[in-house]
A protein has these predicted regions:
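Alpha-helical transmembrane segments
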Residues: 12-19
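Bacterial N-terminal signal peptides that target proteins for export
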Residues: 1-12
């Protein structure tokens, strides 16, 4: 636990420096007491994945003294109304948690020039909009590499959610990571078309297992839990995409390859308080400590497998390994 908090503190410092911020903590915390911050989520904070870590980021912001609010399970068609509701309530900062919200957020933000918007996995940068890009492909690459190191059937599977850029990129990274380890491996990649059909994800995962997959890897928010459950029920291995997913697959889960977006949210908010927000879209991945390997749940994972995966993580962080997203 101590190491966990040391790592989190280090990540926040790295990201704060990425935003060009080194200002007095007392000033930031004093300023934060008068700030209202909202988070609009496409899914549920109970997903043990993307939305859960976003919410954890909001809690970090709350701990700095801000007044916070959040809205879960927001369809794109309702995002503009959610923005306007927070604007009417006097919110100063609005985080949009999904690439799916980009177009509606960019358009609606024009109505509220005094509100600062942060878009996740977006390429938009306007007067009152800043974006940072979580490197989902790196998470997928690590999942694929570990799956290839663990498989006994030479067949591994990735199940994504809605086929938006982050999930598509995660699937591309997964395939390239698996083939980085074993160019001859069989890789199955399929997206669900949604993030909340847990039963459908379980059925698809069981279909994968019937086709020879013995390591399952989800990147589907709430639906990821169905993939983990399928692994538990069929006796294959699973690599989680979020902390705590092992609770639904205690015998199947090997480890989580984590996207700890919470520290990115906190760093973005600190940049707002300091009034020093770079215009360019900032990458948030292995180099920034946002993508990392969690604690292993199984004691029988060979040390050489762990060492190989750590080496791949370092090569992603240094840029030695490049992922092709074309």
């Amino acid at each position: 636990m101590k190491n966990k908090w040391i790592r989190i503190a280090t990540l926040v410092l790295v990201l704060v420096m990425s935003f060009g911020l080194l200002v007095a903590c007392d000033k930031k915390e004093e300023d934060a007491k008068n700030v209202k911050v909202a988070l609009i989520l496409e899914g549920a904070i109970s997903d043990m994945s993307w939305n859960a870590t976003a919410y954890n980021g909001l809690l970090k912001i709350k701990n700095l003294g801000a007044t916070v609010g959040h809205t879960e399970n927001t369809p794109v068609s309702s995002a503009a109304d959610a923005i306007r509701a927070y604007a009417a309530d006097g919110y100063d900062v609005i985080f949009m948690s999904s690439n799916s919200f980009q177009d509606v957020a960019v358009e609606t933000a024009k109505e509220f020039p005094d509100i600062q918007f942060f878009l996740i996995n977006s390429g938009a940068t306007e007067d009152n909009i800043r974006s940072f890009a979580i490197q989902d492909a790196e998470q997928g690459f690590l999942m694929g590499a570990l799956a290839a190191l663990l498989t006994e059937t030479n067949t591994v599977g990735f199940i994504g959610g809605l086929p938006i850029n982050p999930i598509v990129n995660g699937g591309k990274g997964f395939e390239q990571g698996a083939k980085y380890v074993n160019p001859n491996i069989n890789v199955k990649v399929q997206n669900m078309g949604n993030f909340d059909d847990v039963l459908g994800a379980k059925e698809l995962a069981k279909q994968f297992v019937s086709e020879g997959v013995d390591v399952l890897c989800p990147m589907a928010n709430q639906a990821s839990l169905g993939v983990m459950e399928a692994a538990e029920e069929t006796g294959v291995l699973a690599i989680g995409s979020g902390l705590d997913q092992e609770t639904v697959a205690p015998n199947a889960a090997v480890v989580a390859i984590v996207k700890d977006t919470a520290v990115a949210y906190e760093a973005a908010y600190r940049s707002y308080l300091a009034g020093n927000m770079p215009a360019e879209v900032l990458p948030m991945g292995a180099a920034q400590g946002v993508i990392y390997i969690g604690d292993y749940y199984k004691d029988d994972i060979p040390q050489d497998v762990k060492d190989q995966l750590n080496d791949i993580l370092q090569k992603l962080a240094s840029g030695e390994i490049k992922i092709n997203l074309d």
